[in-house]
């Protein structure tokens, strides 16, 4: 009957374009359509932007804290670990960018068509929790920077609330265009380079030991604390939500996917840009490690307390001078105490410079976190919210628990230590980004001739296994040292571990099928991906995507 309403499943089945990805960016950056040469600076400039936004995750307050702790605990010995982490991160981020360019969709959109409904929703909730955890780190870093800049006039709880307003303000810049928005991020990265570079200059670290720690892959005389710190560096650098983010950011460039040479060209320039962006990130992180390796390694709380009192010309307010307790424990090394150490040693201006750097790190990463959450919601559950609503949701989820810690913890020391738990949360979530990205880029029905080659597949699998093994080791050690193994913690840990391992195994099944290591099993809960949601317009004689597989109403009902 005319005007009769159809059930959602029937409508989706008749209109597969409803499942096509919505335009992520209303206005895309044009790329000059000229014959590709070996290399073009003009084209590299056109593709420059997404890689720098991606690199923000390598410079967030959680990473900065991990860096300064690495320097304070292990001297210059772990800089090579930072270098290896950046190289592994680059190779994995390349996969995410390649996926976005070739498929025309970002990871969350692909997951919508790839996994059945319930597993997909579980994956979405896990990704969202990783984003909220990362966002909490940015909130903490920003609140501490306001506290330091105001010499305690702006309390922590007020600094936490300010992050709501400033995020709205900065994201408003997007209305002026993608390029201006990206330029603002580059400005914040420049602020970090200048501020942390200033601290490097005044502390004058030993360059020989710094380069030795960078290129000699060993840790002579390292104890368990140093090994754990090396593990923490890798966990802090490779962030789960960053793969989802990067695969979406590359869609800001208008790539003519009807022409294979343009797809190849985009992949090349995005990789070059990402490599340069992560090189800048590595330099900035190295500056931070070196400053605190030179200044805090081997120092006790009493040593730095004495420095604060004996340096009468540092201009530090008296309340800062008692922040380091009068004991012979290893000096406290977190974002807050690091700023006080710099102020006591080099003058209060060094403290302000440090706070500005942390503020830039917090502001830039909190905006990319909001972006990542927006892409995840639009892709996984096909809901597109106005950006102000998305900010309000993300900020609330991050701010409410952070405010609770600030109000009830009784001091800034406890809010800084919350970063350790949040880094652990990121480690738990990492498999839920690594396994899907490996799955999608290995699937010939999505990537076609751009799927992972055999050598790249082996390298990616090895890197992923190394990262996952390191993370599991860190988690096991962290749970043991934090909660201990007793009659209460053991059953809870086992219960959570069972669910965790089962879901990882579920995702791994799809990965092995995509890599063609095993044949698919046709069951309700291991349904085949909906391949007619994907296209390959550069293939002139390709099979009509809509005929790749036929989907029953039962399968559709599981997915939507």
Swiss-Prot record:
Disulfide bonds: none
Effect of a null allele: Increased survival rate and reduced body levels of iron in response to increasing Mn(2+) levels. Reduced survival rate in response to high Mn(2+) levels or to infection mediated by pathogenic bacterium S.aureus. Reduced CEP neuron death and higher Al(3+) accumulation in the body in response to high Al(3+) levels. Reduced ferritin ftn-1 mRNA levels and Mn(2+) and iron body levels. Increased sfm-1, sfm-2 and sfm-3 mRNA levels.
Main location: membrane
Tissues where this protein is expressed: Expressed in dopaminergic neurons (at protein level). Expressed in intestine with a weaker expression in the most proximal and distal regions. Weakly expressed in the hyp1-6, hyp7 and hyp8-12 hypodermis and in head and tail neurons.
Induction details: Induced by pathogenic bacterium S.aureus. Repressed by high levels of Mn(2+). Repressed by high levels of Al(3+). Induced by low iron levels.
Extracellular side: 65-71, 142-152, 204-229, 290-339, 412-420, 480-486
Pfam families: Nramp
Ranges of the Cytoplasmic topological domain: 1-43, 93-120, 174-182, 251-268, 361-390, 442-458, 508-560
Transmembrane intervals: 44-64, 72-92, 121-141, 153-173, 183-203, 230-250, 269-289, 340-360, 391-411, 421-441, 459-479, 487-507
Domain of life: Eukaryota
HAMAP family associated with the record: NRAMP
Name this protein carries in UniProt: NRAMP-like transporter smf-3
Species for this entry: Caenorhabditis elegans
